[in-house]
Amino acid sequence: MRQILLATDLSARCDRAFDRAVLLAREAGARLTIATALERSPDDPIEPEAQPRWRQDDRLADAECQIRDDLEGKDVDARIVIRRGRAGELIVRLARENAYDLIVTGIARSTGLTRMILGSTVEAVLRERVGPVLVVKQRVRGEYRTILIGTDFSEAARAALRAASDLFPQARLTVLHAYQAAAGPGDTEEKDEAAYQRALEECATFVAATQLPATRAIWCVAEAGLPETLLNQYARDAEIDLLAVGTQGRHPMLGVLFGSTCAALVLSSPRDTLLVPKLRDETPAADVG
């Protein structure tokens, strides 16, 4: 990683995202851009531009002062960007202008609604497909050692696997595929075993076709069930540090941008989650075998 963008509203909800972004930048020797947008407060009936000039300047100065205080002693190359306006528009514009390797942010609110927990900023970045987004929820206890990537064998899932491998080269990667259990007449146990073996083979073929470095070891896991349930269960049992998913796919639950599997995973998992959109200029990988 050479460039990381932290999207923050300077609230306590983004403190963990700040700590993670600083750690990632320091470990990779990357430049960290910290961006915040001064939006109109719901409690303030006056537009920011209509405020007296000294109040406008105070908000800018206070925000910069807070960020500089937070950066003190962090030993990281950082750039601060503070603008008036909508956060989503600012982050998307910065991402397009600078081609960041990773965009880091925190959760918006702890409610049961997808839009509220992630916020419009994350939605805007995913919708415009300007880069992978790391949603930080946990306290920083060290680098990411283990990463679980959910796959439906789509190009979006492939993008998630590539991103996890490129961004975190030292982490152990596990790819999990949730398949539909065998149905219909016949020997159920035999059919289940056949479905399991077929899913494992498809998973291995998918990994090979992604064409990661030859030295990169990938573990494949397949199980019948719902993707979000299995991903969360495996992540808990295997003590996974980070989940990674693509935001488009061919699976019925991943078929739309920010589909229900992706939403349910972010909502229900306490773990940090890497959301990877398929970038507009990506082309499908060649088949292997």
Regions found by a protein language model. Give the residues of each.
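A short acidic, glycine-rich active-site loop
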Residues: 51-63, 191-201
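Short, acidic/small-residue loops that bind anionic groups at enzyme active sites
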Residues: 124-138, 268-277
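Glycine-rich, Arg-bearing micro-motifs that act as flexible, cationic patches
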Residues: 102-124, 143-144, 242-268, 278, ...
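Conserved N-terminal glycine/acidic-rich loop preference
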Residues: 107, 125-126, 134-163, 180-216, ...
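Structural beta-alpha unit
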Residues: 20, 39, 50-55, 69-103, ...
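Small/aliphatic-rich secondary-structure junction motif
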Residues: 1-50, 146-189, 212-215, 268, ...
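Short, well-ordered secondary-structure micro-motifs
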Residues: 44-46, 116, 160, 185-188, ...
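General small-molecule cofactor/ligand-binding pocket signal
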Residues: 33-35, 79-83, 134, 174-176, ...
